[in-house]
Amino acid sequence: MDDMLTKIQERTKCLIYILMERQIRAARLEQLLLDYISCKPHDKLCKSSMEGFTTERSLKYTRDCPQYAAVTTSQPRYRIEKRSKRFPKTAQMELENWYTENEDNPYLSKRDLQQLVHKTGLCAPQVRNWVSNRRRKERTLTISKELSDLLNQDTRCSPNDVV
């Protein structure tokens, strides 16, 4: 009975390792795909890291695991370097100018998107993300301004004003 329990525990441990490895692979693949999609076509670093993802490598977890537990996984050969978080000043100015001109309706049309991609040198997902983030920033600025106005009104009240 103990022997059977030990075998079950060993196999359970191996299955847990396999599941963890698959989750890690899926997360890595998802991140690589997101990075690759947001890269410009001429960005060699992103392309080379995606090519490296197809390289197979065998993993063995423990010597107690049965043969079927040896799993192959793909590992990138190159690390994706973190890119600069700020856009060039000219691109920021173009995007900011577009936003102020379209403040009443700050949503991109296909034509606007193409023009901004051409003017800024950024790719379409970067432009869409910037505009989305800018709308969010505008909402929070508006809300915080309204809150501060309300707080200022409350502090101006005197005890005689309260009924």
Swiss-Prot record:
GO terms for molecular function: DNA binding; DNA-binding transcription factor activity, RNA polymerase II-specific. Its main location: nucleus. InterPro entries: HD, Homeobox_CS, Homeodomain-like_sf, KN_HD. Keywords: DNA-binding, Homeobox, Nucleus. SMART domains: HOX. One of its GO terms (cellular component) is nucleus. The keyword Calcium does not apply. Pfam families: Homeobox_KN. SUPFAM superfamilies: Homeodomain-like. It is found in: Nucleus. The keyword DNA-binding applies. Residues 80-142 bind DNA. Mating type proteins are sequence specific DNA-binding proteins that act as master switches in yeast differentiation by controlling gene expression in a cell type-specific fashion. Belongs to the TALE/M-ATYP homeobox family. In P.angusta, all mating-type proteins (MATA1, MATALPHA1 and MATALPHA2) are encoded on one idiomorph, consistent with the fact that P.angusta is a homothallic haploid in which any strain can mate with any other strain. This is Mating-type protein ALPHA2. The lineage of its organism: Eukaryota, Fungi, Dikarya, Ascomycota, Saccharomycotina.
